[in-house]
Regions:
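Extended helical coiled-coil dimerization/tether regions that scaffold
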Residues: 163, 172, 176-296
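Switch/communication elements of ASCE P-loop NTPase nucleotide-binding domains
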Residues: 1-27, 32-47, 251-379, 456, ...
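Charge-patterned, long linear interaction tracts outside catalytic cores
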Residues: 247-251, 401, 406, 495-557
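Beta-strand elements of well-folded, non-transmembrane domains
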Residues: 25, 80-84, 115-119
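Activity-critical C-terminal alpha-helical subdomain
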Residues: 453-524
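Electropositive, glycine-dotted interaction segments
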Residues: 89-192
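Conserved P-loop NTP-binding catalytic core
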Residues: 40-105
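RecA-like P-loop NTPase motor core
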Residues: 336-337, 342-450
Length: 557
């Protein structure tokens, strides 16, 4: 079974949020979108200990825009569905027969946690729901809710620095085990040994021998085999290979992640990293032993915190093969470059709710996906985190706008503005991608026939947007001709080594300058010339474009 959607209203930092999940869901966004509140909501409602969390006054949302007014109610709704038709007949799900709701030939479960403040007391109700929101009344609702928590607990992995190696930690608040005492002691012994090895890896990696690594790998296998089933299953892959080039570039046809650990070609450092990750998973489930029938949902929180990008890629190749539903939060462009586009969800907080932007199957055709995969996901993954894309035709403009912004006192990267050269990838796929991900955009086109075609294409895609907001057309053939006519003629003559008295056509002067110097060098020379000139030579149109994109970026904070 698969967690399909969560609806949150009035919980901690989230006013309203509706978020769908895939087999792999990657969440990105700026710091204020409510990541901690979302992950806490999942962790508390699907706790491995199968205990109900008692809501506190601090769990109710405070709307600072409305004068620090605290919400009087909060609600969390989880929606589940089968991975395939007939899965509800499986032994682990048979008991939920009174609560199944059929939609689109699949069985669904709806769970609601509803809390409200009444007479300075918090009253909480938990129910299964019909599709229309009406409560399914059953005398053993709490029992079945706990059973679902046992079947699909949240296992939340954070930075290893948040994990404390405290052998004296109290576990009295949990039902620590339902296993026989001998088996429980063996599990504890294995975990203590694994903890000791991983702690030494963190402090003295050079002192861990190859034999100890091999022994620890076998230990991991014996422990994790209790929680995972590395066998064929009926879950469909997130995307076919045609939609996601290089999807399995690291796994070498390994279906079992442990096979990666024992391959001779893996470096010792890589094995240590992967062992540490898996140990973090085992520890993250807490002091409760998961049942053999459990199918955990893994939350991987900002895994780039302590991993070098190369190690991050190796770790991800290991994690992506784990046969479980995974939720990943990250600020790493390197990690975004190896996940499917359709797994990425960009969250943006607004005064009324947290908006989710994503790419669903079919919204981009195969050709569009190929282009944006190559030009954005693989070569410019940091662009996914931008607030605004400034789309330009050539390399000169990329250098020029970034450097000119510095002269006007702005840092485009700090403002969340990414300058993208679109000529090779095509314009339409980039605009479609920006709109799907909620990224603002503005195009600067040349005044030549090709530039006018780009401008016409933008006009056809405006919808309700104004042309002034989305499009700037240079009143010249290209950026070089535009600058030449705006007072930069002496510079171009100097770069082309042509005297002022030589009445050569503009076109030939610019051609000679470009032939003698690379475009980045010319762009930097233009910036230096602007900076050193006594009068303010920066063209008004360039100032206007910079001001426009900065206003757009600041308007969506």
């Amino acid at each position: 079974m698969h967690l399909e959607r969560i609806e949150i209203a009035g919980f901690r930092g989230i006013k309203r949020l509706s978020l769908s999940f895939n087999e792999l869901t990657v969440l990105i966004g700026e710091n204020a979108w409510g990541k901690s509140s979302l992950l806490d909501a999942l962790s508390l409602t699907l706790c491995p200990s199968a205990e109900f969390y008692e809501m506190k006054f601090s769990d109710f949302h405070i709307d600072h825009a409305m004068g620090h007014e605290r919400a009087s109610s909060l609600q969390i709704v989880l929606r589940w569905h089968e991975d395939y038709q007939g899965e509800y007949h499986a032994r682990r799900y048979r008991a939920f027969d009174p609560f199944w709701v059929e939609q689109n030939n699949l069985k669904h479960l709806y769970i609601q946690i509803d809390s409200h403040i009444e007479n300075d007391k918090i009253i909480t109700h938990r129910h299964f729901l019909h599709a229309d929101g009406h409560i399914i009344k059953h005398p053993d609702t709490d029992k079945f809710l706990r059973q679902l928590m046992v079947l699909h607990p949240i296992v939340r992995i954070r930075d290893a620095r948040h994990l404390e190696y405290d052998n004296n930690a109290s576990t009295t608040t949990y039902n620590t085990s339902t296993m026989p005492p001998a088996k429980n002691r063996e599990s504890d012994r294995i975990q203590r040994r694994l903890d000791n090895t991983c702690r030494r890896l963190m402090t003295q990696p050079g002192h861990v021998s190859a034999a100890e690594i091999k022994s620890s790998i076998n230990t991991l296998r014996s422990l994790v085999d209790h929680y995972f089933a590395f066998t064929p299953h009926k879950r469909s892959k997130a995307q076919p290979h045609s939609y996601y080039p290089l999807q399995n570039q690291h796994d070498d046809q390994c279906l079992n992640p442990f096979d990666q650990l024992v391959q001779p070609k893996m470096t010792k450092q890589a094995k240590l990293i992967l062992m540490g990750l898996l140990n973090a998973y085992i520890r993250a489930r807490g002091p409760v032993d998961l049942k053999r029938i459990s199918r955990p949902i893994m939350i991987l929180e900002d895994p780039e915190g302590r991993l070098h990008p190369i190690m991050l890629h190796q770790a991800w190749a290991f994690i992506q093969n784990m046969p479980m539903q995974k939720l990943l939060t990250t600020n790493s462009p390197e990690l975004l470059s190896v996940v499917p586009l359709t797994a990425i969800k960009r969250l943006q907080r607004t005064p009324q709710k947290t908006v989710v932007h994503s790419i669903n199957n079919g919204e981009l055709n195969k050709d569009d996906i190929r282009k944006v995969t190559f030009h954005v996901r693989m070569h410019r993954p940091s662009a996914f985190y931008a607030r605004v894309w400034l789309l330009v035709e050539g390399e000169t403009e990329v250098w020029l706008f970034n450097e000119m912004a510095q002269l006007t006192g702005y840092n485009l990267a700090a403002e969340g503005i990414h300058v993208i050269e679109f000529a090779q990838s095509g314009l339409k796929p980039l605009i479609k991608l920006a709109r799907l991900l909620g990224i603002e955009w503005h195009l600067v086109a040349d005044g030549d026939p090709a530039g006018r075609k780009y401008a016409d294409k933008v006009r056809s895609l405006l919808n309700i947007d104004s042309e002034r907001e989305r499009l700037t057309v240079l009143p010249a053939k290209d950026i070089e001709h535009f600058l030449f006519k705006k007072g930069y003629e002496p510079l171009f003559r100097q770069l082309a080594n042509i005297s002022e008295n030589d009445q050569m056509p503009i076109r030939k002067i610019i051609y000679r300058a470009l032939k003698k110097h690379a475009k980045p060098d010319i762009a930097l020379a233009i910036v230096k010339y602007t900076q050193e000139s006594e009068s303010d030579k920066m063209p008004l149109l360039i100032r206007w474009v910079l001001k426009r994109v900065i206003i757009m970026a600041r308007g969506i904070i």
